[in-house]
Amino acid sequence: MDLPKNRFKAALRAGQRQIGLWHTFASADVAELMATCGYDWILMDTEHSPVGPAEALAFLRAVAPYPVTGVVRPGWNDAVEIKKLLDAGAQTLLIPYVQTPDEARAAVAAVTYPPSGIRGVAGVTRATRYGAIANYAERANDEICLLVQVETRDALAQIEEIASVDGVDGVFIGPADLAASFGYPGQPSHPEVKAAILDGFAKLKKLGVPGGILSRDDTLLRASAEAGAQFIAVEIDATMIRTAALARRAEWS
């Protein structure tokens, strides 16, 4: 059995824009439903959702039959948590709250086997298809895509250094936490925050490093795309359900 190809990583390297959704429910059914909708990637958020490795595994299995990449965000830049997600078969991870180049290097080490990294070796996991993939340990990193999240003023000031760490495949700018760090909590589209985000994407574009963002503000999203953002999440499942439910109820008020 061959190592699964990471369409998302290949698309980023080819300069192709990737449009995605945020998945927050511990529901493989919802994940599979979303996988039928034509998006390029779906991210399971374990940072701000009551989900763990078991639910992440169910998510990865649910989306696997479809032409969509399952991305997982661990709760923290934690080598043990990252190891579990990789062993479950995740090939693309978004690491939250990366503040410095050293923290980016720690994330790289966590997804890499020794001697270059610290990922623990286990031969019988879903990632190896329970031993069916030959030479998995030697080839795993060819298809692992590591995205790091910059979401504070201090981290944004170091975005070029963080993005330049060998092994980082993309940098995601988080508008919500960034706005809070600028003193505008709950205002991710504030002009000062927006200007900082667009400046960050311009720097990433100059370096040739893919940039990403999540927002429901189409004005911010389009400006980010024009500035160079390449992997763009345009909605959150919980928000879509709530918005549709409220709109339908209003029609029958």
Curated annotation (Swiss-Prot):
<dbReference type="GO" id="GO:0016832">
    <property type="term" value="F:aldehyde-lyase activity"/>
</dbReference>
<feature type="binding site">
    <location>
        <position position="151"/>
    </location>
    <ligand>
        <name>a divalent metal cation</name>
    </ligand>
</feature>
<dbReference type="InterPro" id="IPR005000">
    <property type="entry name" value="Aldolase/citrate-lyase_domain"/>
</dbReference>
<dbReference type="GO" id="GO:0046872">
    <property type="term" value="F:metal ion binding"/>
</dbReference>
<dbReference type="InterPro" id="IPR015813">
    <property type="entry name" value="Pyrv/PenolPyrv_kinase-like_dom"/>
</dbReference>
<feature type="site" description="Increases basicity of active site His">
    <location>
        <position position="87"/>
    </location>
</feature>
<dbReference type="InterPro" id="IPR040442">
    <property type="entry name" value="Pyrv_kinase-like_dom_sf"/>
</dbReference>
<dbReference type="InterPro" id="IPR050251">
    <property type="entry name" value="HpcH-HpaI_aldolase"/>
</dbReference>
<keyword id="KW-0670">Pyruvate</keyword>
<keyword id="KW-0479">Metal-binding</keyword>
<dbReference type="Pfam" id="PF03328">
    <property type="entry name" value="HpcH_HpaI"/>
</dbReference>
<feature type="binding site">
    <location>
        <position position="177"/>
    </location>
    <ligand>
        <name>a divalent metal cation</name>
    </ligand>
</feature>
<comment type="similarity">
    <text>Belongs to the HpcH/HpaI aldolase family.</text>
</comment>
<comment type="function">
    <text>Aldolase which can catalyze in vitro the aldolisation reaction between hydroxypyruvate (HPA) or pyruvate (PA) and D-glyceraldehyde (D-GA). The condensation of pyruvate and D-glyceraldehyde produces 2-dehydro-3-deoxy-L-galactonate. Has weak activity with hydroxypyruvate and D-glyceraldehyde.</text>
</comment>
<protein>
    <recommendedName>
        <fullName>Hydroxypyruvate/pyruvate aldolase</fullName>
        <ecNumber>4.1.2.-</ecNumber>
    </recommendedName>
</protein>
<keyword id="KW-0456">Lyase</keyword>
<feature type="site" description="Transition state stabilizer">
    <location>
        <position position="73"/>
    </location>
</feature>
<feature type="active site" description="Proton acceptor">
    <location>
        <position position="48"/>
    </location>
</feature>
<dbReference type="GO" id="GO:0005737">
    <property type="term" value="C:cytoplasm"/>
</dbReference>
